[in-house]
């Protein structure tokens, strides 16, 4: 596993996390 794979994995995790936060915020949690 090289640095590019780690960077892509981290980017996907951050993107998914922020997206779910936006969805939660709009749901009025």
From Swiss-Prot:
GO terms for cellular component: chloroplast thylakoid membrane; cytochrome b6f complex. Signal peptide: none annotated. GO terms for molecular function: electron transporter, transferring electrons within cytochrome b6/f complex of photosystem II activity. SUPFAM superfamilies: PetN subunit of the cytochrome b6f complex. The chain crosses the membrane at residues 3-23. GO terms for biological process: cytochrome complex assembly; photosynthesis. It holds the Pfam family PetN. Keywords: Chloroplast, Electron transport, Membrane, Photosynthesis, Plastid, Thylakoid, Transmembrane, Transmembrane helix, Transport. It is a single-pass membrane protein. The keyword Thylakoid applies. InterPro entries: Cytochr_b6-f_cplx_su8_sf, Cytochrome_b6-f_cplx_su8. Its main location: plastid. It is found in: Plastid, Chloroplast thylakoid membrane. The 4 large subunits of the cytochrome b6-f complex are cytochrome b6, subunit IV (17 kDa polypeptide, PetD), cytochrome f and the Rieske protein, while the 4 small subunits are PetG, PetL, PetM and PetN. The complex functions as a dimer. Belongs to the PetN family. Component of the cytochrome b6-f complex, which mediates electron transfer between photosystem II (PSII) and photosystem I (PSI), cyclic electron flow around PSI, and state transitions. This is Cytochrome b6-f complex subunit 8.
